[in-house]
From Swiss-Prot:
Species this protein is from: Schizosaccharomyces pombe (strain 972 / ATCC 24843)
Designated name of the protein: Putative D-lactate dehydrogenase C713.03, mitochondrial
Domain annotation FAD-binding PCMH-type: ranges: 93-272
Keyword Methyltransferase attached: no
Family: Belongs to the FAD-binding oxidoreductase/transferase type 4 family.
Catalytic activity, EC: 1.1.2.4
Length: 526
């Protein structure tokens, strides 16, 4: 029988990148082309009015001194002040709004939308602008409605664990508040220092621990939202059970602002675990990753909180662009991060130690380490959470595909994508080839693969090679073209690969009920 071949992790230096940079502090040195220039098939819908000085004055009177407004029509305004609202964090999508509104209250949101609806002014709701599909920035000159100033935590019940808060509360701030009460927010994301809880709800973000805590569809108990005509929909209940008619709030979770603007949420939060363990494994094959996942679920059962998959390419990028070293001496084709969360430290350590011993004895994994303290735990998580930022440093851009697939075929998509790019003469080490490499990582626990193609520059040849081929591949294997990033602008043309014509028709029918003038989120979603 193998002895436990785990050693203490050598503390690494912190990532030199800021994973949680505030969006409004960013200045874009190299701005992307305007989205409407990159997407030639898109044309501004003439039914939408153009912003006037008179409109701006009305918005100023609505917001008053409480909120904030950036007026691009004012010649004294620095155009760069609107960049953080016009450009997504990947530096891929760029709108041309002349007005960013930051209301402070639900009533202000209501009055803004009522006026926009009457005047047929198009609106894009925006949270932390950390999205990956171009949903949170304008395509043309839509008004940006940013919820960042609506950031109050209103109530918390320490018995039930239900928190009521504004949609503009930063996810990390909400979790820090709950930590002081012995609770945690039931969602964790790599962008937690910038993303807002309302945006998380609007995109139905899954996060790192969906395996343990489920989706926001189950955690959100109540909601306040504003419809496009200004109607305030108050369903801010804190009840676990409410079986009185249709659960309307579910329509807004994952709607991306298509039906209205989420302004407040009530969320049930789990107790914060007193014991957390993290293991990091090197695995010789994807077949063994599947075996490791099965064994892990059997061994850890109720305390398993995360099972994250990373390929060797992703870890090579983290090595290169984070300035950190790998926790394992040798390179391996795949890596897995396993996390447990529980209430009994000794019990949890025994279970995860037994798991490692079993995986080594069965030769399912090649090597592994266990974090011995909080610092090492964070270091191991950075190997996973830092991938996205390191990809952004690898070249001039990244093509991102967030899909869900049956586990047996999940990584086949990465291999097939790489083969296809090579066949099309797009992937090579030389500068004349646009593609640098193909990276696969994701949430193994819920079948969510993040397929990333790092490029030296965005290139239409790459897009034509991959789209709709990737979506056809996913559809053929009974997967979903969007696991958690949403549809936005990027995936609107391809929703038919995951939803039937009848379902798309029903979604459009609901849109006409909630937003007959179509002012919310134009050119996107479905």
């Amino acid at each position: 029988m193998h002895s436990l071949q785990c050693r203490r992790v050598i503390p690494f230096g912190k990532l030199s990148l800021s994973l949680h940079a505030p969006r409004n502090a960013l200045r874009f040195v190299h701005k992307p082309a305007f989205t409407f220039e990159s997407y030639k098939s898109l044309h501004r819908d003439p039914k939408y009015a153009k912003l006037s000085e008179q409109d701006v004055q009305v918005f100023k009177s609505i917001i008053g001194k409480d909120g904030s407004l950036i007026d691009g029509l004012d010649k004294s305004t620095d155009p760069a002040d609107l960049d953080a609202f016009n450009i997504d964090w990947m530096n891929k999508y760029r709108g041309k709004t002349q007005l960013a509104l930051k209301p402070k209250t639900t009533q202000q949101v209501s009055e803004i939308l009522k006026y926009c609806n009457q005047k047929k002014l198009a609106v894009v709701p925006q949270g932390g602008n950390t999205g990956l599909v171009g949903g949170s920035v304008p395509v043309f000159d839509e008004i940006v409605l940013n919820l960042g100033l609506m950031n109050q935590i209103h109530t918390f019940d320490e018995i039930s664990g239900v928190i009521t808060l504004d949609s503009g509360v930063i996810l990390e701030n909400a979790d820090n508040f709950l930590a002081e009460k012995g609770y945690m927010f039931p969602l964790d994301l790599g962008a937690k220092g910038s993303c807002q809880v309302g945006g998380c709800a609007a995109t139905a973000a899954g996060g790192l621990r969906l395996l343990r805590y489920g989706s926001l569809h189950g955690s959100i108990l109540g909601m306040e939202a504003v419809l496009p005509d200004g109607t305030i929909l108050d369903n801010l209940v804190t009840l676990r059970k409410d079986n009185t008619g249709l659960d309307i709030k579910q329509l807004f979770i994952g709607s991306e602002g298509y039906l209205g603007v989420i302004t407040k949420l009530s969320v049930i939060c789990p107790k914060r675990p007193s014991s957390t363990n993290v293991a990091f494994f090197g695995v010789p094959s994807y077949e063994n990753v599947l075996k490791a996942f099965s064994e892990t679920r059997s061994h850890l059962t109720e305390i398993l909180s995360a099972f994250e998959l990373m390929d060797n390419t992703s870890q090579t990028l983290v090595d290169k662009y984070s300035g950190t070293q790998r926790p394992l001496e040798d390179e391996h084709p795949f890596y897995v991060l396993v996390e447990t969360q529980g209430s009994n430290k000794e019990h949890d350590e025994q279970k995860i130690t037994a798991l490692v011993e079993d995986l080594l004895e069965k030769e399912i994994i090649s090597d592994g380490v266990l974090a011995q303290d909080e610092s090492q735990l964070r270091v191991l998580w950075e190997r996973r959470e830092g991938i996205t930022e390191c990809l952004a440093k690898a070249g001039s851009g990244v093509y991102k595909y967030d899909v869900s697939l049956p586990l047996p075929v999940l990584y086949d998509l990465v291999n097939d994508t790489k083969k296809r790019l090579i066949e099309f003469n797009l992937l090579d080490d030389t500068p004349e080839h646009p593609v640098i490499d193909v990276v696969g990582f994701g949430h193994m626990g819920d079948g969510n693969l993040h397929l990333n193609i790092a490029v030296r520059q965005f290139d239409k040849r790459v897009e034509k090679c991959l789209e709709p081929w990737v979506y056809e591949w996913v559809s053929r294997h009974r997967g979903s073209i969007s696991a958690e990033h949403g549809l936005g602008l990027l995936k609107k043309p391809f929703v038919g690969y995951s939803k039937s014509k009848e379902m798309i028709h029903l979604m459009k029918t609901l849109k006409n009920v909630f937003d007959p003038n179509g002012i919310m989120l134009p050119y996107k979603y479905v």
